[in-house]
Amino acid sequence: MSLTLQSLKPQKGARRRKMRKGRGIAAGQGASCGFGMRGQKSRSGRPTRPGFEGGQMPLYRRVPKLKHFTLVNPKRFTVVNVGELAELKAGTVVTRDSLTEAGILTSPKHALKVLGDGELKVKLTVHAAAFTASAREKIEAAGGSCELID
């Protein structure tokens, strides 16, 4: 049998008939229709909204309003100060890997961010994910350049 558009049909057992509730005991879902005996969930109409606790003060109103919250995926940086870059040779291209080889960084796990603490008199080309304004100022004042990378 060839596979054509008109010969396609669902797999055996994939399509089930709609359950007709309240159509007699022999139908399997008669009498209380699978809703149990009595109570709010057995009545007609819309069910209770999510978070409704039967009139009890709900959890979202019992807990205090929190002022601050932590970010789910914060940006993490490996930081280095401009003063630490001063011990590198002039004309060096500074990256996260080159700083690890030089022994300035110990764990290059995250993206590199350059902070502006310390003095710099050496011309460097710095590749980093972020710079503070003072760090960028000091690097460019020494004749170097700052390049943003991802």
UniProtKB/Swiss-Prot annotation:
One of its GO terms (biological process) is translation. Keywords: Ribonucleoprotein, Ribosomal protein, RNA-binding, rRNA-binding. Residues 25-37 have a biased composition (Gly residues). GO terms for molecular function: rRNA binding; structural constituent of ribosome. Residues 1-57 are annotated as: Disordered. The keyword rRNA-binding applies. Binds to the 23S rRNA. Part of the 50S ribosomal subunit. Belongs to the universal ribosomal protein uL15 family. This is Large ribosomal subunit protein uL15. It comes from Synechococcus sp. (strain RCC307).
